[in-house]
Amino acid sequence: MIYIDNRQNKIKAQEDLDKLINEIIDYALKKEEVDIGYEISVIYVDNEIIKEINNDTRGINKETDVLSFPMLEYPKGRVFSESYREYSFGVEYLNEGNLVLGDIVLSLEKALEQSKEYNHSFLREVCYLVVHSVLHLLGYDHIDEEEKVIMRKKEEEILESFNISRG
């Protein structure tokens, strides 16, 4: 189950964007071997709100494009498919039988700015940010170069499956 909550009014969120985000998240989770019903919340915000959340949660007082709040903990360098595939989750991890993977907070305002900066579509930018964030919910990171290469490759593979590419 994917919940999309639009908490901003600066960028008009299209129904077809929500549909595509649902499809991409579902595809990414299947590709990453999430073999249980799941719950993810995607919250659209503006730059002001994401700046406040970024400051409150990370101590960084500036706007960003997307924030990921995973509900599961992962050993360093391990991801969902290595840590939790076929795992028997306790009720504290479930909501109505679905595994709560976490929340994605996405600034549509920042996504629009970045799409112009990188000279590609708003749709491509939003989809990239969602895929990036979903991979964080599944334990991927990009702190060291080796992890970054793996994560970038996964992002591009997922986007290419939807014919979404740079440019």
Curated annotation (Swiss-Prot):
Keywords: Cytoplasm, Endonuclease, Hydrolase, Metal-binding, Nuclease, Ribosome biogenesis, rRNA processing, Zinc. Binds 1 zinc ion. Its main location: cytoplasm. Zn(2+) binds at H132, H136, H142. GO terms for biological process: rRNA processing. One of its GO terms (molecular function) is metalloendopeptidase activity. PANTHER family: ENDORIBONUCLEASE YBEY, CHLOROPLASTIC. Its EC number is 3.1.-.-. It is found in: Cytoplasm. It comes from Clostridium tetani (strain Massachusetts / E88). This is Endoribonuclease YbeY. Single strand-specific metallo-endoribonuclease involved in late-stage 70S ribosome quality control and in maturation of the 3' terminus of the 16S rRNA. InterPro entries: MetalPrtase_cat_dom_sf_prd (IPR023091), YbeY (IPR002036), YbeY_CS (IPR020549). Its cofactor is Zn(2+). Belongs to the endoribonuclease YbeY family. One of its GO terms (cellular component) is cytoplasm.
